Amino acid sequence: MGPRAKTICSLFFLLWVLAEPAENSDFYLPGDYLLGGLFSLHANMKGIVHLNFLQVPMCKEYEVKVIGYNLMQAMRFAVEEINNDSSLLPGVLLGYEIVDVCYISNNVQPVLYFLAHEDNLLPIQEDYSNYISRVVAVIGPDNSESVMTVANFLSLFLLPQITYSAIGDELRDKVRFPALLRTTPSADHHVEAMVQLMLHFRWNWIIVLVSSDTYGRDNGQLLGERLARRDICIAFQETLPALQPNQNMTSEERQRLVTIVDKLQQSTARVVVVFSPDLSLYDFFNEVLRQNFTGAVWIASESWAIDPVLHNLTELRHLGTFLGITIQSVPIPGFSEFREWGPQAGPPPLSRTSQSYTCNQECDNCLNATLSFNTILRLSGERVVYSVYSAVYAVAHALHSLLGCDNSTCTKRVVYPWQLLEEIWKVNFTLLDHQIFFDPQGDVALHLEIVQWQWDRSQNPFQSVASYYPLQRQLKNIQDISWHTINNTIPVSMCSKRCQSGQKKKPVGIHVCCFECIDCLPGTFLNHTEDEYECQACPNNEWSYQSETSCFKRQLVFLEWHEAPTIAVALLAALGFLSTLAILVIFWRHFQTPIVRSAGGPMCFLMLTLLLVAYMVVPVYVGPPKVSTCLCRQALFPLCFTICISCIAVRSFQIVCAFKMASRFPRAYSYWVRYQGPYVSMAFITVLKMVIVVIGMLATGLSPTTRTDPDDPKITIVSCNPNYRNSLLFNTSLDLLLSVVGFSFAYMGKELPTNYNEAKFITLSMTFYFTSSVSLCTFMSAYSGVLVTIVDLLVTVLNLLAISLGYFGPKCYMILFYPERNTSAYFNSMIQGYTMRRD
């Protein structure tokens, strides 16, 4: 006997030994094509130990799992409904073979049984393309670990497997599990529904509890990744001790539960997400009740979201609000009556030989246990039941297509698993107003519901309060929830309260949800879309008050025509302009008279013309500064004013030279007269002033500048020169020197003839200019803003008036009111008198 033959014999012997008579007709229905069903009708909740691990556990020794029996009845109901439907698989009878897998204890033996022939032989072959298994498809099991165990076998044969409640994301891997499909949304959508629920109620500080199995670890990790993207923080995550099917909970595990619940008590988080099979939660919630941890929102994963046994712990109502994520409720007409009155037990069909049976096909107490929960099962709606129901119909529609059925007959033939799998992928039909088809990952896009646990017997124990649509990835139809809080207010679960508008976050600790709120300072604002942790400075032309989310334009301040000080100075400048113009006319009409000639002759007209130009520059101080107005302020006006002062200084020097220095230095005086000394001096001073002006403009520029008012930051001062005080000292340095020179020469000529003695007038003009300039610089060091501009303009106009009226005014007075003194004879007599006094 070869090795291959020995292997075949060994498998045959194993299957034959494990085969036992079925005692419950609910588990088997003969038909042309059989469906395999794997359901958890029992679960180990008492820690019954099997010492011999080679022995298949006897599931009936465990406690009845009501939901599992309910789902098994859904499969039976769907098969019988299809068999009674003349439009679907006409003339073909579907049968089923159902096995209790005891949650996760009994998976391998049923799979081998389903894969084997009727004689319990599973041959070893190189090619299974033409292999005929006992069943054409398998419905179940219910949890991810069991599904992966079963799928690893069935995928080798490409035997279709449709699970109705396993949500693990790894099951979407069609390379590993090419024959696996499911009629429930994946964990990706379950977790997204949870996250959107938290976002809707603004919960960003949560606790995550997971089981120690693959289901808990994987889904806990997926949830953590999703929460991190949405700035939702996990206060802490703990692993619940898993209730092993064949073990009692140890003292260490119980102490672990005590520690976890104590940690819940100490935490400020009030939203608890639990990813765990229902079997692991009975002891946990008993400990929660013992420690009286209340006031929390519990978010249940689909594994226990609608568990009637846990719901039967009515004391849970005192712990807080229970919300669960589960598949949508689709009422199935007639199913409740079928579940309640369906057969419970009966002898197996006599036609089945003993070798065709398998173990764990009995449940003596299932119907009685189900009847005790019948009300809650009926009120809770057909949720996972519809997933089983639609899975059976998906196989039926695939068979209908594969057998080439029409409205009356089907062509019965051998169906190979891989052929049926191809057709299942193609199905697209409507079942109870819902479209059933499989996406590329093998999932059906049924929407999810958020349910709230209710303990009022007059209400649905699992009341739907919101819906989640996988295709849109949106949470919709959110209804009012009965919260456990006073006045039914939405519970708060945040590490830190939300910051007010215009407050930045200062992190506290490692969690982004824990922070202090700090007001943004004036001049800064908070842009929530860019950075919630730093206040951004406003642009230079904008400002903000404290705790602002935006800036506003600063108020631009400059001299305006409608202001009273501006009007007053403008009127004063107009008076000076008209006075200077009148003086110019008077001097022009009396050009050849001694007074005009003694005042400088042609030089007077140059001074008066420049004074008129200077008065005309006054309006450029009003209004927003421009390049042109700044040029007039910084170049034209200083140049005009300097030439005027230089004329006075040169004229004073010339008079002193004529009367006092000509006799002492005749040669020097002759050079002065011969080479037009006054005009050469004025030209030199003008060039020097132009150099000073150009240097000043190169240093400061001509473009208007803005600066913030230090006393009122919301105001922006617009000026031609940001450093006007220093610039003023530089530009007026020559003018101040000339004023001192002019004053000195005027003082030296105080004894000259009265007609030529201008000491009083020059002293008045130059002293006023010197004093006003020094006062202006002092004022600018103490004040700023538009007030400096108005004072500067006022001083400028007064300096012009001092020259116009202080220097030229007395001469006009003499010309108009003392014409007898404006004669050559009078001037000669005054000179002779001065000469005689000196002698």
Swiss-Prot record:
Q: InterPro entries, per this entry? A: ANF_lig-bd_rcpt, GPCR_3, GPCR_3_9-Cys_dom, GPCR_3_9-Cys_sf, GPCR_3_C, GPCR_3_Ca_sens_rcpt-rel, GPCR_3_CS, Peripla_BP_I
Transmembrane parts of this sequence: 567-587, 603-623, 636-656, 682-702, 728-748, 761-781, 785-805
Residues carrying covalently attached carbohydrate according to the record: 84, 248, 292, 312, 368, 407, 428, 487, 527
What Gene3D superfamilies is this protein classified in? 3.40.50.2300, GPCR, family 3, nine cysteines domain
- Please provide the Gene Ontology terms (biological process) for this protein: detection of chemical stimulus involved in sensory perception of sweet taste; sensory perception of sweet taste
Q: Which residues lie on this side of the membrane: Extracellular?
A: 20-566, 624-635, 703-727, 782-784
State the source organism's domain of life: Eukaryota
- PROSITE patterns, per this entry? G_PROTEIN_RECEP_F3_2, G_PROTEIN_RECEP_F3_4
Signal sequence: where? 1-19
Q: Where in the cell is it found?
A: Cell membrane
Give this protein's Gene Ontology molecular function annotations: G protein-coupled receptor activity
The function of this protein is:
Putative taste receptor. TAS1R2/TAS1R3 recognizes diverse natural and synthetic sweeteners.
Subunit text: Forms heterodimers with TAS1R3.
The name this protein carries in UniProt is Taste receptor type 1 member 2
Native source organism of the sequence: Pan troglodytes
